[in-house]
Amino acid sequence: MDNQLKQFAQSSQLAGGNASYVEDLYEQYLVSPDSVDPKWKTYFDGFKGREAGDIPHSAVISHIADAAKDALKAGTGNGAGDERERNVGRLITAYRSRGHLDARLDPLGLAAPVNTPDLGLPFHSLSDADLNSEFSTGGVGGQPRMKLRDLLARLKATYTGSIGAEFMHISEVEQRQWIYKKLEAAGGNYQLDADTQRRTLERLTAAEGLERYLHTKYVGQKRFSLEGGDSLIPMMDTIIRNAGKDGVKDVVIGMAHRGRLNVLVNTLGKNPRKLFDEFEGKFEHDEHASAGDVKYHMGFSADVATDGGPVHLALAFNPSHLEIADPVVAGSVRSRQERRKDTARKQVMPILIHGDAAFSGQGVVMELFQMSQARGFAVGGTVHIVVNNQVGFTTSNPLDTRSTRYATDVAKMIAAPVLHVNGDDPEAVVFAAQLAFEFRQKFAKDVVIDLMCYRRWGHNEADEPAITQPLMYQVIRKHPTTREMYAEQLEKAGVIAAGAGKAMVDAYREKLDAGEVTTELAKVEKTPPSSPLFVDWPKLLEGKLSDPVSTKVEKNKLVELAKLINTIPDEVQLHSRVAKVYDDRRKMAAGEIPGDWGFAENLAYATLLDEGHALRLVGQDVGRGTFTHRHAILHDQKTDNYYMPLRQLVDSPEKATVIDSLLSEEAVMAYEYGFSTTDPNTLCIWEGQFGDFANGAQVVIDQFIAAGEAKWGRISGLTLLLPHGYEGQGPEHSSARLERFLQLCALENMLVVVPSTPAQAFHMLRRQQHLTTRKPLVVMSPKSLLRHKLAVSSLDELANGEFQHLIGDANADAKKVKRVVLCSGKVYYDLLEDQTKRGQDDVAIIRVEQLYPFPRALLAAELKKYGKATDVVWTQEEPQNQGAWYQIRHHLQFCLADGQNLHYAGRARSASPAAGHMADHVREQQQLVADALVNPFNDTFAE
């Protein structure tokens, strides 16, 4: 039997684990049963698939092992003729699988040829003598039988022309069949009508015309030219016009610097006069953007006209950190879909434009692919366009840029189809664009277009590329432009009159000279305030952090909501530990015991949902909570179903979203930032598993959260919950790097808080949505305080309180106090417990709950109460060079009353955030508490 199985594997090309080969045979059988080996035909006949319609491919794979013996015993076939039919079937499969390797993709003709013997006749035991014989086509060309000569020509035209398609790695049979039927129906002849051909030429003229205009008028200025990749503009035009016809209302575009100015003018319809002003140093910054940004980072939005009606286009703002804008775009798209109640995800679509080097090199690309079908992040598929100019700045050798054949191979991790297309064949480009859009709409899945092109100039216009790519640029300098070649082609075909191409060039230049918009814009009425799509951005932009807000909730309403979200249906069987948590929460709701952190946090969400706000809480393990405190998602121990108490308060599940994210910080945080910038009515929260891991998304924090408003005028209310505190868990589980966030603070760009009680957390979360503006909120959230016996709050504190920037010492007698200790967060309880043990009454402990904007006036007034206190001590758990000390010392100094001196008590300087051994942690903690409360000051140490 072992020999039989080995023979079976070899004869059926299963060797090497190529299980997809069996699926290909089955598809071939469905189209033409006689074209497969009789053994396989007998086996496939058992599925009754042709009579009943196609079946899931898994049914084939799951039976292969069991069927091997029976398949070998099946019919013996009908001789050499049948064998040749089978060989032709294998040839067809080879072209579908590997034809892209022979495709004419490189406009420069520099790509090294690939050895593809399996695309030749001899590999499949066929020869020139068979060329005039007819064989079953397997559906190629729409004919059941064809001469091998004609069939081979059709396969070459389809799979080795200007489009190289990779799709046989897709596991879903329906998707593979859909793609090869589309490709084979065209057969390499993309059949654009004359109007589309003329429009394609006009768009190429626009792409080239803008670059040449800028090149001659603003010599040497950076613009990151699209030249060489001009076909991007007709590609975008095709996708957007098809989107309009298919009912798409919004398209959100993300792209880096290459070609961005061209897309702004020729796709989104930015007035070229405004672009020229920017080249001349006359910027029209959003008045809310205090710093501004370079012109090739700026976003834009417009409504463009299509045959299907207006389509709103939004080009996302973009830093120079390549690909990081991708998840920001995806988050914005998801938000727009939810606002439109677009559950099918057909009305809002993302287009992401990448560079080849960044697409294969930046890890955030992989992270976003992994999110693309996850239920909390899916957007119905993204159209990816890789502007593949075959060079990354100065690096062009694939041996240096990647370890895969194609820059796009990372997309195969989610079985996305890839269409490689020669950028010098505009009609193939248009066909690929239309095919990609249709695939996205039909299958709600990502699709990649690899636009093979070149870069006519250097990385920027002041760069000399021949230094590092001498041979490539010898070819490029002699190479005609895509527009020139296509205009000549259309003139020869009689599609345009002689000289019409030149007339288009002149007409476009006249538009630029006149400062006229170069694409068709649509007039769209403003969204009325009564519309669910309306967002009052001007009001939020005018709001200030200092505007008074109330976070109080009527106590009766609070109790009602607390009872509602803590009453679990009888049919939901909770884990015993969770059942105990909810038993306690019901007691908290009744006022029998004070509320803990989890109770107050969930109740804050409930009050906001009840008021009409939405909630989106995302992060690793957020449903339960890393420290088992939240339990916002309950898992039935009998059925494994889940129950979300907060969803009792909303009419749509998406209004109360709690998502356990994939194990990514960078892409997920960026996604939530994008969501928050589009929907200010949702409390968007990203929680770190531990705050220490937030720096995995440092680029998001630096480029977007901290600076997005200053650079681009984009406001965000994203909340970061970052578990922070020193409990002896070592250097990777202690610090959210508070010092880094404080360093980023300026001009009221965000809030940084360290809440120490459940009531503070309750009012902090409510305040975030009740502010008259939107600012990122960075929270050093607790770990051990989640169950600390002293970290509790009453219902009255929740109902009637407010967020306190500063909490004074209610027990201190100002007349006795000689030393005032200032601190933030969990260390307060360490100080309080030690003070109580010592029986000290000459020390007051003040908690600074908001570190930015710093409450100077409040602290100065509080310190003034302690006229006999000569020493004020800032105490922190973090090492001296970390934490808040160096970032707030100037504020503390300012707040001192006459006769008061400032001191430091905390850990010594350290390159690592925390000690790795519990014994060291305990010793250091005891030392800093004693230094704060009783020990003499070491001011030399504090410098």
Residues covered by each model-derived region:
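Conserved phosphate-handling catalytic cores of large alpha/beta enzymes
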Residues: 394-404, 412-448, 452-458, 466
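Extended, charge-enriched "interface" segments that sit outside catalytic cores
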Residues: 5, 47-232, 248
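Subset of Sec-pathway N-terminal targeting signals
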Residues: 4-51
